[in-house]
């Protein structure tokens, strides 16, 4: 196992970024979520689906995906943990994150699932962190 050469302040910056990004997603603020990606960022979150490309494409994909919850008072929470960062030659970061999605309905018991691994390429800019690409793999789909 290699030791990461990512500075602690950068690691903390990425954790804060993920917290804000997931809170935007869970609150249904899809434009805010999409703005955490580069202009040409890619987002692939469902097995077998084509990636959404660009911020407008990401918003459209999230709106399409969440239509299934239109008449359902469900609250979904994305829990990111075990963030592993590795510097890439171009100055960006490879990020591998374990993710659990917790779903709860009023008066119900929280349910955990799916269990996923998030593979990101992150850019650190003067303005902060942006996601260049995201591929989400689902553990239940593993061979």
Descriptions of predicted regions:
Residues 9-11, 28-30, 37, 70-73, ...:
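Intrinsically disordered, low-complexity segments enriched in polar/charged residues with Gly/Pro
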Residues 1-35:
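Short, low-complexity N-terminal intrinsically disordered segments enriched in polar/charged residues
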Residues 6-9, 50-53, 110:
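A structural signal for alpha-helical segments
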Residues 26, 38-39, 124:
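Residues at helix-coil transition
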Residues 2-4, 71-143:
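A beta-strand edge to alpha-helix "cap/lid" segment located at domain peripheries
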Residues 32-88, 93-98:
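A solvent-exposed, acidic/Ser-Thr-rich amphipathic alpha-helical stretch
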């Amino acid at each position: 196992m290699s030791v990461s050469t990512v500075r602690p302040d950068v690691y903390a910056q990425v954790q804060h970024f993920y917290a804000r990004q997931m809170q935007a997603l869970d609150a249904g603020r899809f434009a805010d979520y999409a703005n955490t990606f580069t202009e040409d960022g890619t987002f692939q979150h469902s097995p077998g689906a084509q990636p959404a490309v660009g911020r407008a494409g990401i918003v459209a994909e999230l709106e399409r995906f969440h239509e299934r919850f239109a008449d359902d008072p469900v609250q979904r929470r994305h829990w990111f943990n075990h963030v592993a960062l590795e510097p890439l030659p171009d100055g960006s970061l490879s990020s591998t994150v374990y993710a659990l999605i917790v779903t709860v309905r009023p008066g119900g018991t929280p349910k955990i699932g799916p269990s996923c691994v998030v593979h990101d390429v992150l850019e650190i800019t003067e303005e902060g962190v942006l996601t260049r690409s995201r591929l989400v793999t689902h553990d239940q789909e593993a061979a």
